């Protein structure tokens, strides 16, 4: 065995061995318990970043541990390969998205291999290949036939100059990111999948997900947003149609003083015909961004339409306003306003001088003070005619019943969740498999014409999708009739909603899934990824699973038993101010820092001598130039060190602070393990361990070994606190390094201990452990070695620690046999020099002994 630890030599050798032996390739095996460990698949952006490395290291540790427990472990990987960034990069690099994407996949695959992740590469998928998306297209046509897919117009961000649709992130300050033209909201026909048909089940089944973080479940509950309320119909003077609104607070109905409609509502459009101010307002609303998050914070504005609605219970006339906070896509595009008891309505009414009528008493029974803000709490009604004196529930029911009786209201369950719009007016995505005949009939693409293949050899002009720009591409025939293909492509969340299931049978040609394989592996046992996916991806992922279940492909209700959301990776961030006052961010690698005695950064400069401003730790990002390239770190320290640091520096679900000093520490620890194994094996063969012949000290050391095995097993398996597992192994290593190596049983004990340490470290640092296991004479490859099992007998304490007090003050601690008598304990206490000096020349008047815990000597 080499004396020096050289990761650059051993890691490539071990990786080659895994490749040749196909160590991590698995097939279904009914005789073994399965374990499906999955990390969210990466987007092939070009290079791995530390966030990827953290996610995949956690997954690999879990997979390798479960494999050592004897389970049949599936850990696949693939590429979420469609999407907008490829289009931008293709234009910038004067290429097409396909070659750019495939080059990135090849590069990143190599990076994943150098990190030693134990993937079953035979199952690798790239979502941009027709072999993959053909099944998604077929499934979509089946959903269409089931009535779960429909087309309707929906608002998008439209750049009038480029004549193209923009994603929300391509709208900068209301303008197109490319040409700076003012962006408009435009209604265009788009395809939707009816996720709302599954809203109740998606909500209800969250209760089955015991091993998902509560934060994620709460976010999904809020996003689905189930509410119970009443739908109320208003007559409008001089308008042909009625207005319908939905409210969850019918108890406040007698305080409704105006209605608000969306700028796009037919009533507003009609009123604008002879109202220039309203027409201008509608125009302004058309140019606001679609993003819902921005709706909440923007200034609330409106214009009176001049129409008056009739309050169905009081008969009063109340004004109808057009307002920018009402969206056509949500509900009916009209809301009732109760400014006394809703803060948004209150601010709007205050701004435009509209009536504010209180109808709920304050908690103390007095009339509410509405001079500053609305009273939003529930309470007892007043100012409400026959409903005065009723509390929330009674008022809700009485008013709902009264409205129903008059034929102007009905109870409704509503959802905040909207159907999933899957159309994207982009090129680099899977074509939507629908066609339109010359007479306007819309049909799904016939199965014998699937897949609809996206042409990859295209020229990107940066504006129009090549398949929209080429009229020939859309032409096809269906049943002998000319037809035009849909030129929109799928939202890329489509591909990532079912990839986990395709991994179970990636070569299957008869359909989307091989049910036998899918039901052997599914559900996923642990799914690892960032919390930023809580609502979009993780909701679509659950939805698709239910769709596949209802199509008879899978039997489980949910796709993943456990969800682990790893924390972000942070790094130091520095900048200097340039000549024009701009911030120039400098990589932490290039910052020369001075620290105080506590290790805090107090001064920094770069190689060019710029004084740097230190802004603390923040998420690694391109914008702050504080990403650390994993490849550089692997070249400097080896993959095992990077992996060990990632798992040791912080609990998996908390943020991780990248500190190179910590990486160096992880590297030193691996070298210490290497050194101890080297010194141990250099002394030649080892005798068999005879546990009955061990001395007390040897038994105590063996107890530490087996207690560590028990703790590490619990930390990795049940608690998933990987950092504390590593800390326990480090603590044991310190004891082993100090243990005497005189007799043959000393060496036999160290042999047992090191074989356990190397197996416990294997999930974290598999290359070095592969090598050390061979050096220690372990049987076969460590990849097939069983996880060490703690010996219950070895862990039994035969000694105990007794606290010794003199006159009630602690004067020392002594180790005694578990079954020691009071006399033996007293005698041992007298030999303890820290205690003895307090007993010198005094008489012990009384002895208080709590067996195995405390000895108190009362002296005088």
Curated annotation (Swiss-Prot):
Renumbered ranges of motif 'KMSKS' region: 619-623
Catalysed conversion reaction: tRNA(Leu) + L-leucine + ATP = L-leucyl-tRNA(Leu) + AMP + diphosphate
Compartmental location: Cytoplasm
InterPro entries: aa-tRNA-synth_I_CS (IPR001412), aa-tRNA-synth_Ia (IPR002300), Leu-tRNA-ligase (IPR002302), Leu_tRNA-synth_edit (IPR025709), M/V/L/I-tRNA-synth_anticd-bd (IPR013155), Methionyl/Leucyl_tRNA_Synth (IPR015413), Rossmann-like_a/b/a_fold (IPR014729), tRNAsynth_Ia_anticodon-bd (IPR009080)
Motif ('HIGH' region): 42-52
Protein EC: 6.1.1.4
Predominant place of localization: cytoplasm
Keywords of the record: Aminoacyl-tRNA synthetase, ATP-binding, Cytoplasm, Ligase, Nucleotide-binding, Protein biosynthesis
Stored SUPFAM superfamilies: Anticodon-binding domain of a subclass of class I aminoacyl-tRNA synthetases, Nucleotidylyl transferase, ValRS/IleRS/LeuRS editing domain
Binding locations of ATP: 622
Keyword Cell division part of the UniProt annotation: no
A GO CC annotation given for this chain: cytosol
GO molecular function term, any single one: aminoacyl-tRNA deacylase activity
Gene3D superfamilies in alphabetical order: 2.20.28.290, 3.10.20.590, HUPs, Isoleucyl-tRNA Synthetase, Domain 1
One Pfam family here: tRNA-synt_1g
CDD domains: Anticodon_Ia_Leu_BEm, LeuRS_core
NCBIfam families: leuS_bact
Family affiliation: Belongs to the class-I aminoacyl-tRNA synthetase family.
PANTHER family to which the protein is assigned, alphabetical: LEUCINE--TRNA LIGASE, MITOCHONDRIAL (PTHR43740:SF2), LEUCYL-TRNA SYNTHETASE (PTHR43740)
UniProt name for this protein: Leucine--tRNA ligase
Organism of this sequence: Salmonella typhi
Gene field: leuS
């Amino acid at each position: 065995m080499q004396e020096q630890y050289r990761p650059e030599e051993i890691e490539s050798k071990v990786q080659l061995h895994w490749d040749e032996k196909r160590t991590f390739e698995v097939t279904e095996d009914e005789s073994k318990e399965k374990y499906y460990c999955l990390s969210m698949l990466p987007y092939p952006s070009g290079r791995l970043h530390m966030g990827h490395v953290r996610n995949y290291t956690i997954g690999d540790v879990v997979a390798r541990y479960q494999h050592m427990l004897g389970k049949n472990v599936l850990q696949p990987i693939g590429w979420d390969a469609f999407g907008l960034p490829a289009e931008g990069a293709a234009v910038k690099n004067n290429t097409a998205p396909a070659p750019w994407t495939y080059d990135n996949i090849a590069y990143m695959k190599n990076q994943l291999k150098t990190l030693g992740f134990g993937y079953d590469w035979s199952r690798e998928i790239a979502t941009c290949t027709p072999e993959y998306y053909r099944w998604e297209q077929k499934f979509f046509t089946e959903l269409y036939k089931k009535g779960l897919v429909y087309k309707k117009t929906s608002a998008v961000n439209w750049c009038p100059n480029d004549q193209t649709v923009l994603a929300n992130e391509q709208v900068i300050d209301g303008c197109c990111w490319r040409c700076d033209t003012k962006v408009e909201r435009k209604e265009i026909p788009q395809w939707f999948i009816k996720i709302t048909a599954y809203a109740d089940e998606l909500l209800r089944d969250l209760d089955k997900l015991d091993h998902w973080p509560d934060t994620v479940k709460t976010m999904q509950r809020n996003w689905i947003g189930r509410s119970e309320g009443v739908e109320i119909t208003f007559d409008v003077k001089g308008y042909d149609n009625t207005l319908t609104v939905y409210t969850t607070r019918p108890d406040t109905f007698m305080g409704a003083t105006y209605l608000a409609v969306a700028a796009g509502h037919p009533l507003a459009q009609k009123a604008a015909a002879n109202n220039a101010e309203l027409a201008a307002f509608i125009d302004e609303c058309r140019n606001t961004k679609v993003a819902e998050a921005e709706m909440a914070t923007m200034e609330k504005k409106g214009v009176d339409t001049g129409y008056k609605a009739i309050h169905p219970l009081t008969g009063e006339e109340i004004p109808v306003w057009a307002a920018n906070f009402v969206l056509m896509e949500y509900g009916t595009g009209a809301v009732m306003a109760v400014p006394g008891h809703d803060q948004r309505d209150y601010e709007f009414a205050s701004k435009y001088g509209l009536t504010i009528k209180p109808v709920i008493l304050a908690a103390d029974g007095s009339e509410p003070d509405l001079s500053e803000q609305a009273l939003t709490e529930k309470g007892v009604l007043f100012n409400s005619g026959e409903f005065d004196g009723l509390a929330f529930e009674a008022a809700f029911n009485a008013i709902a019943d009264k409205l129903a009786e008059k034929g102007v209201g009905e109870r409704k369950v509503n959802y905040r969740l909207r159907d999933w719009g899957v159309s994207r007016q982009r090129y680099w995505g899977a074509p939507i498999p629908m066609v339109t005949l010359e007479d306007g009939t819309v049909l799904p693409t016939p199965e014998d014409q699937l897949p609809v293949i996206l042409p990859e050899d295209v020229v990107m002009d940066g504006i129009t999708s090549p398949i929209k720009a080429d009229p020939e591409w859309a032409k096809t025939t269906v049943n002998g009739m000319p037809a035009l293909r849909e030129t929109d492509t799928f939202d890329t969340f489509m591909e990532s909603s079912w990839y986990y299931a395709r991994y179970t049978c990636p070569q299957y040609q008869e359909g989307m899934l091989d049910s036998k394989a899918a039901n052997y592996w599914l559900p996923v046992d642990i799914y690892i990824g960032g919390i930023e996916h809580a609502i979009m991806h993780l909701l679509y992922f659950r939805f698709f699973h239910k769709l596949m279940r209802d199509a008879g492909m899978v039997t489980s209700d949910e796709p993943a038993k456990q969800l682990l959301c790893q924390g972000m990776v942070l790094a130091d961030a520095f900048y200097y101010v340039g000549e024009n006052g701009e911030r120039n961010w400098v990589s932490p690698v290039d910052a020369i820092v001075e620290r105080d005695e506590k290790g805090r950064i107090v001064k920094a400069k770069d190689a060019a001598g710029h004084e740097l401003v230190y802004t603390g730790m923040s998420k690694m990002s391109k914008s702050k130039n504080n990403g650390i390239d994993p490849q550089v770190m692997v070249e400097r320290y080896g993959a095992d060190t990077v992996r060990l640091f990632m798992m040791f520096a912080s609990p998996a679900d908390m943020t991780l602070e990248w500190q190179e000093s910590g990486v160096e520490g992880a590297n030193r620890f691996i070298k210490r393990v290497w050194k101890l194994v080297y010194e141990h094996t250099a002394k030649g063969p080892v005798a068999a361990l005879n546990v009955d012949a061990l001395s007390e000290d040897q038994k105590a050391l063996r107890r530490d070994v087996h207690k560590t095995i028990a703790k590490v097993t619990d930390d990795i398996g049940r608690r998933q606190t990987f950092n504390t597992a590593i800390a326990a192994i480090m603590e044991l290593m310190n004891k082993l390094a100090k243990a005497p190596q005189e007799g043959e049983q000393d060496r036999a004990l160290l042999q047992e201990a090191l074989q356990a340490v190397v197996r416990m470290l294997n999930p974290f640092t598999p290359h070095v452990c592969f090598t050390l296991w061979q050096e220690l004479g372990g049987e076969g490859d460590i990849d097939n070695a069983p996880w060490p099992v703690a010996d219950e007998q070895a862990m039994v304490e035969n000694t105990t620690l007794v606290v010794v007090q003199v006159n009630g003050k602690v004067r020392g601690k002594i180790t005694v046999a578990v079954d020691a008598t009071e006399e033996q304990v007293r005698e041992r206490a007298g030999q303890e020099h820290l205690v003895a000096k307090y007993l010198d020349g005094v008489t012990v008047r009384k002895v208080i002994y709590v067996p195995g815990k405390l000895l108190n000597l009362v002296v005088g």
